[in-house]
Amino acid sequence: MPGSALLCCLLLLAGVKTSKGHSIRGDNNCTHFPVSQTHMLRELRAAFSQVKTFFQKKDQLDNILLTDSLLQDFKGYLGCQALSEMIKFYLVEVMPQAENHGPEIKEHLNSLGEKLKTLWIQLRRCHRFLPCENKSKAVEQVKNDFNKLQDKGVYKAMNEFDIFINCIEAYVTLKMKN
C-alpha cells in the first residue's frame, strides 16, 4: 500500500509540474500581449482606413448603432462578453454583407476581417482577457438595430468600426490595469 501511495504522489506531482509548465508557456504569451495588442489595434485602424471613406459616403443615416451603452458594457462586468459577441457580430454578420457592396473593397475587408480574427484568437488564448459566458444587452440592442436597418445596416456598422476599435482598446486597457 505505501508503494502505491508513493507512486500516486509522484504521478500527482509530475502532473502538477507539467500543468505548471503549460501555464507558464501560456502566461508568456500573455506577458507580451500588451505590446502585441497595441500593434494589432494599430493594424486594425490602418486596415479600416482603407474602407472607411467608402462606408462613410454610403451611410446616410443620422442614428448611431454603437451607442454609449455598448462602451459602458465594455468597461463593466459584461466587458468580456460584449467584446466577444461584437467581434463575432462583425466577423459573421457585418463583414460578409459588406463584401457584397463593392468589389473594390473586398480585399481590404478580407484583410480587416483577418486582423480582427487574429485579435480574437489572441484574446481567447490569454484567458484573463476573455474569460466570459454572460450575455450583453447592449450587444443585443446593436444587433436588433442593425437588423432593423436592413441593407443600410452594413453601411452604419462599417462606418462605426472605428468606434468598435476604441471599445476594444478601452476593454483591453482596463484588463491590463487589473
Swiss-Prot record:
This protein's record includes keyword Disulfide bond: yes
Entry-listed glycosylation sites: N29, N134
PROSITE patterns on file: INTERLEUKIN_10
GO biological process: branching involved in labyrinthine layer morphogenesis; cellular response to estradiol stimulus; cellular response to hepatocyte growth factor stimulus; cellular response to lipopolysaccharide; chronic inflammatory response to antigenic stimulus; defense response to bacterium; defense response to protozoan; immune response
Signal peptide (residue range): 1-18
Pfam families: IL10
Molecular functions per Gene Ontology: cytokine activity; interleukin-10 receptor binding; protein dimerization activity
Keywords assigned: Cytokine, Disulfide bond, Glycoprotein, Secreted, Signal
Cell compartments where the protein resides: Secreted
Primary location: secreted
Disulfide bonds: C30-C126, C80-C132
SUPFAM superfamilies named in the record: 4-helical cytokines
Gene Ontology cellular-component terms listed: extracellular space
Gene3D superfamilies: 1.20.1250.10
Family: Belongs to the IL-10 family.
Functional note: Major immune regulatory cytokine that acts on many cells of the immune system where it has profound anti-inflammatory functions, limiting excessive tissue disruption caused by inflammation. Mechanistically, IL10 binds to its heterotetrameric receptor comprising IL10RA and IL10RB leading to JAK1 and STAT2-mediated phosphorylation of STAT3. In turn, STAT3 translocates to the nucleus where it drives expression of anti-inflammatory mediators.
Binding partners and assembly: Homodimer. Interacts with IL10RA and IL10RB.
Listed name of the protein: Interleukin-10
Primary gene name: Il10
